[in-house]
Amino acid sequence: MKKSTLTLGIIAALGAAWIGGAWYTGKVAEEEYVHQFELLNQNIQQSFSAKGLSVEVSQVAIERGLLSSKTRYDIVVKDPNKPESVFTLPFEGTLYHGPLPLNQLSQLNLVPTMFTSVDNLVQNDTTISWFKVAKGENPLSINTTMNYQRQGATKMHFAPVDISNEKDTWHLGKTNLTLDFTPQGIRQADMTVDKLVYQEADQKKRIQFNDIKAMAEYQPIKEWDLLSTGQQWIAAGETNIEETDEQGKTNLLTVKNWKIDLNTVRKEAFLDFAMNLKLEGTQLNQIHFGDLNLNMAFNHLDGEILNQVLHAKFAQTEDTPLTDAEIALLRKFFDKQPQFAFHPMLTTQAGKLAADIDVAVATSDLATLSRGKIFSLFHHFIFKVNSDKAALVEVASAAEQISEKVEKAQADRTAEMKVNDSLKTPIQQGILVDEGKHIKLDLVLENGELKLNGKVIPEEQVASILFLAAMSMGY
């Protein structure tokens, strides 16, 4: 037998096997394709139902072919309180059968895959306005890939749009959203937006975000339907907020970079929630204020009670006074001794301004307030301040330049004088401790005793102490 004949025979056999595999996989892929929509509906219903919206994928239809299938489906958005408000987003596309989908094979991608799909938004009465502002590009295209372990990703591409009316203009740049999923449903979402701009028609206000990125990873908690664990973050590059006042002066706030991190962890019947905010290169009218790093934590939150509180909140149709049952629920929540921590720090070229507040609630019995026993409400209470004097002067100088519109040299002299004057009395009274280039304050509840900088003080003096400390640090 000639080698060429043998080669052709092998190719033909492989081709037949591929086509046969694609035909068989097509049936399995179609079933899994529909199943993924069922899982998606469960995920989005859980997310939107508490917010008073109904969102679901419906009218899923498949026309099977040899190597691919034609698909159609609708995404329907309803407001249960407004039956006339129904928005239907129709999609059409192609489901490519594995194990080697045609669209992957054409790109020399030989990774075995159960299916890939490519779907595009279809123009109708609801979407026609979206097509117009997308300027010829399909407003929304969706690409999905799933492997034989039933894991994969859905990538959504939103075309840039410009939306204008009599009051304002919006520009949303190129946007991409990726949803990673497992057999249990969506587990992580990643989003990028190259630019978002808002501008008022009279041009008195303009806000621009550049290079927006976000990630959300979560695990639902079966017994607490409105809660989940996991990490989320959102970040952006240079952000500008420009506003013109009634006198015609334009103020420009610029943040070079910013990021917000969130993290929720379950510890048996309780949840710990943490947040971090970073603002880098903050300027107002080109006057530098430094970098802000803010850490917050809400720990030891009773999951069952918190879930009930959220249900009660979402059930409200308007702002109404708390019912007796809701007040009792909140008191029960605080009786579980939740903890709150707040740690801001501002870093400037001259130094740092830092504070620590750490409070754990002991009881919800507010009757102790009428007896003047404020700190009996707390399991522990910590309030600390640690600041560089030079940093205080630098921040005060920046505020002076903006409020009084003076040159930096004059603002520096005025700021130094005012800071020194404001610190004098609290230092003399022992509220603040002078450590040369630094000042500090330690107010700690320890073994039932309230200590200021290591010395026990009467509880009734706390309000005046905190007031004087705030006044001295405020400038």
Predicted features along the sequence, with ranges:
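Glycine-rich, small/hydroxylated-residue low-complexity segments
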Residues: 5-9, 16-475
